[in-house]
Amino acid sequence: MRAWQDHVSGAAALARMRGPGQFRTKAGVRMFLMLCHTVLISCIQSGLPMPQTLIDLRREIPAEHQSGGPAWLVAEPIYRALQVRYDIKTGKLAILDEIVEALSSADERLASIFSELPESWKYHHVQMTQPDARVLGETCHVYPGLIESTTWNVARGIRILLAETMIEQLCLAVGEGDLYTLSDCHRRSLAKSITLLDMLGRAIIASVPQHLGVVSIRDVQNFGGEGHAVAVPAKKQICRAPSPPLTHEARARSRSEPTARTTGCLPLFDPTRSKAQNDKAERFMSLAGANHTIIWPLYVVGMSSACTPETRQYAIERLQVIHKETALEQARVVAGLLQGKVAPPTLSTELLDELPAVEMGTLPTMV
């Protein structure tokens, strides 16, 4: 934890010394925003809030240097989400009703930005005409550009962490008891969070093929992109990193690992704050320095309690491909972290069967 705090404090101090004067040029603004991104990932992994110094400085960026649109607007809700998680972690938020309200509000602020997107920011559903190992399943999403895809995935990653925290807190309230010890409202929140967690993870995975060059927006335009569903052939595969053989322990863990999709089980604790991670904080600093936009989203999905063994293996293989093609050490390190993930404790399927059904009207059509 000390490594994280030193990293965040040092970055904030550097930005404070430069002051608003760094915003006189586009280059200065760009460097500051890159710093904010690095600190953001560090804060996410360490459970720290975004330094107020950086938040205040960002608000002083002149309007002519602000990008505007969802990519700009999403930052403040993300910072708020980090603060909520920190307040829960430190006990500032300790009453269950207040915790649920704060987490729900933070998620809704993020969701509202994406519910009112212009058409130019929405992704297309693409059906592959032939199997491709770089696509999990038969469909993927194609975005107008990298900025759109990255913005969607950053928001999804934060929403996954909020959902994990919601599940953790509600499960801790249940303990060894019955789910009916929760109020109807809280049981609905639990059911919605479990469903949303799966939807968000699937959406991130569906964005991966475009990041790896399997499909592009040109394919959508060339194959009749006016509609939402488009069938396109996959591009020639450049290379594929072979998956290392699973150890006996890994095979056993894979066979026994519960999944939200097939068993309905869920974790009692947020897997992104495991003890093993705190013991290897220096390795997680790789995430803060990752300059390939899909590495952190793949990490979040792979560590999610809703991630199936199949999806986690897909994430590991894609990270290995990124490492092989780009030599980015961060991709190799994160792949190793996912390979070493231990399944969290879970609730029984019987308890989950008592959860109310999630009304589709309460879920967004696009996440």
What is the meaning of each model-derived region?
Residues 119-367:
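Fungal-biased detection of long, low-complexity, Ser/Thr-
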Residues 2-215:
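Central/C-terminal regulatory/activation regions of fungal transcription factors
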